[in-house]
Amino acid sequence: MAVVARTAEQMRQWATTLLDALGGEQRAQAALPFADDGARRWLEYRPLSRPGACVAEASPAARKAAHRLLSTALSDHGYAQAAVIMALEEVLDRREGWWRGRHSDDYWVSVFGDPAGHSAWSWRFEGHHLSVTMTVQDEEISPAPIFLGANPAAVRFGDRPVSRPLGPEEDLGRELLQSLDAEQRAAATVGGSAPYDIRSGTRPRAPESLQPLGIAAGALDATQRALLDELLTLYVGRLSPGLG
């Protein structure tokens, strides 16, 4: 708990620093009531505008404070993944012919409630393929929802990867799948193709049952279970120590 308490204090510090560094209009955009469920439960991983202050329009001091706030929620490798995901906006813009005007600072930050007060408050850092929300109550933190994606998933020089921010997740997932025998794979395979998008989309509540599908962890052998545990640890390990 001491680790989480320190993280909560760091979040308070950098959320306050961020708000102080923002100008009047941007501060009004970023500082929102905790009771505003519509804005607080917002989830949008597509490249669209959203509630909050845009990092691209902030001063250098405010941009740095926004990144310091984001870094309080993430581990070293989690923050590295987030930073590369944001940088890939420039690569994607080039691949699309620059017509869309994507920018690596087109991310928005919001603070809900008063981080210097004694009531629950939360913050969100969000943009294309990146959404991180943390809710803080005293010395406790609820680290959800959090989403990391990547486009392009990989940039290569021939067969050599130049950038592949979510490569470990993909590699471990495929390694686990390849380890399954025919019967296990039949149980684990729940569709012939991947879903078009995230099942719950951008809705704050899932519209359908999230009844678990696939193969139970208890049906895996020791080697397969170790791969599953490593994969889960990788995902949970995106968070700062004590939050997973």
Language model segments and positions:
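N-terminal mature-domain "stem" immediately C-terminal to a signal peptide or N-terminal signal-anchor/transmembrane
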Residues: 1-61
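Short, conserved sequence motifs enriched in acidic/basic residues, glycine, and aromatics
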Residues: 21, 57, 179, 219-222
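Short hydrophobic alpha-helical segments that form membrane-spanning helices or hydrophobic packing faces
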Residues: 30-32, 188-190, 229-230
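Extended, compositionally biased non-globular segments
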Residues: 215-244
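Acidic/His-rich structured neighborhood in mature extracellular/periplasmic domains
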Residues: 37-214
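Stable alpha-helical elements in mature extracytoplasmic
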Residues: 11-18, 26, 62-65, 169-176, ...
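Short, tandemly repeated low-complexity microdomains enriched for cysteine and small residues
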Residues: 30-34, 82-86, 244
